[in-house]
């Protein structure tokens, strides 16, 4: 009888929610919007990478951290925030010169997230668009699907098909952003 009770307790306490009510319910490598960067690396290991036109936010790349799904993780933090609250999580899965598998992985992730967010976020398929670069001969494309919450927070799934290696690697990016960070990134950062 004790074993059955213990099993039932484990079953009901270890279940994860099948749907997310809020972007903070969604984790990437155990990291959520609203967490502190200090939960994942020590303060002395934080290297701030600022954006070209505004220093309101910066990103921190998690280096020498064991990751299960992503090849790389970046966290966005508001400048001068002593609690290091995360406003954005960006994970990358690289597919070296393999656009087909990049698109396939993007579709798999979008399918999973569509179920996870089905009652709480609008799905917007942006389709394929040209990647804007200074290289006139560049034919790189990006394919993006967004999930927008009523709060304005968002999750983006993007396959970058980079034809010019100087622009970056072909791969899937999954990013979660608060409304404030997303708006800033689109209007002030670059």
Walk through the language-model features, giving the residues of each.
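Sec-dependent N-terminal signal peptides
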Residues: 4-18
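Non-cytosolic coordination micro-motifs
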Residues: 21-64, 87-190
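Compositionally biased P/S/T/G-rich terminal and signal peptide-adjacent segments
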Residues: 61-85
